[in-house]
Amino acid sequence: MREPMLYRSVVVGLLARDCKEAILRNKPRIEKLCSFFDEYHIVVVENDSVDGTKELLHDWAQENGRVVVDSFTDESRRLADCSVERISHMADLRNRLLGDIRRLPVHDIVIMMDVDIFDFDVEGVIDGISQAPDDWGAIMANGRLTLPNHKLYRYQYDQYAFLAYDEDWHDAMYFQQKRGRLLDKRVRKHAYYPVKSAFGGIGVYRYDAIKDLHYQAVRLKEHPQDAFCEHIPFHLEIIRQGYQNYVCRRMTVNSGLLEVKPWVVFLMCYLPQVYEMLCKVSAFMYKMNWR
């Protein structure tokens, strides 16, 4: 039996760019999620879409007065995944979204969501909130990628945002495949696994825990052209205020298929140590190419 909902109002925050099909797929789930609350708003920051995303979002806002769409032209180019430029850009987008949220009436809870995930368990999110430990400031999703032809093998999604309590900042950028397996193992054992940071496609926040926070890009000392995931410094600030962050096992997100070659699937499933070594080589070559 589901615990009674202790929080009455929610705002769902989304970033959107060229994700029309994902919005069409997840729109009913987002609205169902909001239906568990007495009051809600959905805030979307959209930029530079060319696939009909902008028009779809504005149609959504026309049919639902609780949807707020902030569209703008940014003309940003493709940036290296971990580069300071890309993380700074993502931090700016998330701060713009936070600014839009703060202009609304105060809500109990803020749910940040990657709208391009394949799907998510609505009841899992609600249960994750209603059954959370009293000290929670952020509850992150148990996000998974599925390997093609290996549906029983789950690959942890969004390892870049993950930082365990027994790790320091330096660890967040290295051995991500090994750390992803560690996260998966620990989440399987704990209904709420305490972390310094994670995301997994959905983050649920107490409004009071983030009302004065902002996202930022923090450079790596060893590789100053790269930055930590913008979620990590944001989540560490929540902990500094006396809250606790958790990954909720029940709050499952299906991020879709991990599109890799069959031989890579074999390595990931049966030879993880070899795969980790190849990833290190690949990461080194990738960074060399972006210099």
Predicted regions and their residues:
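A conserved acidic beta->alpha catalytic loop
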Residues: 45-55, 74-76
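Conserved catalytic core of nucleotide-sugar-dependent glycosyltransferases
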Residues: 117-217
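C-terminal catalytic/acceptor-binding lobe
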Residues: 184-291
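Active-site-proximal specificity loops/subdomain of glycosyltransferases
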Residues: 60-107
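Short beta-strand-to-loop acidic/aromatic patch adjacent to the donor-nucleotide binding site
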Residues: 105-118
